[in-house]
């Protein structure tokens, strides 16, 4: 039950039994969020949900209760925020062999495309999505 400032939720679409949009907007502790449905991979349709709590740390068990999912569906974000955001579209170099999702498929409470473009400009990425 760690406390984290940012985390990722990965869950099959049919396992998420809450209104995702309403849940994301309900908790003001979540400063930034972005999600996508990966439904063109070679696996079952699943969500990748990015959560950022700003300067606060939030317990993963609490977040699991918000989304009514097991806590083990929540992962610590490894690497930089940009790496996590790029993974949503399989934009990382290591994900080039997977389906490339359009940035317009990502739903976020911030300008996702600008965030990715700015990361490219400052050198976090070799090419723009």
Language-model-derived ranges and their functions:
Residues 50-52:
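Extracellular, beta-strand-rich glycan-interacting domains
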Residues 1-27, 54-129:
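Catalytic "initiation/cleavage/transfer" segments centered on a nucleophilic residue
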Residues 7, 33-34, 47, 72:
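A broad, low-specificity signal marking well-ordered, structured residues that form hydrophobic/aromatic
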């Amino acid at each position: 039950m760690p406390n984290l400032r940012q985390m990722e939720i990965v869950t099959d679409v049919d396992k998420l039994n809450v209104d995702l949009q309403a849940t994301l907007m309900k908790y003001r502790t979540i400063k930034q969020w972005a999600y996508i449905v990966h439904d063109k991979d070679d696996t079952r349709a699943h969500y990748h949900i990015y959560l950022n709590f700003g300067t606060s740390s939030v317990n993963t068990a609490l977040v699991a209760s918000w989304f009514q999912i097991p806590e083990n569906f929540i992962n610590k974000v490894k690497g930089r925020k940009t790496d996590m955001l790029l993974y949503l579209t399989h934009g990382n170099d290591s994900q080039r062999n997977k389906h490339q999702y359009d940035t317009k498929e990502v739903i976020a409470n911030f300008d996702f495309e600008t965030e990715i473009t700015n990361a490219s400009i400052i050198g976090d990425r070799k090419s723009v999505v």
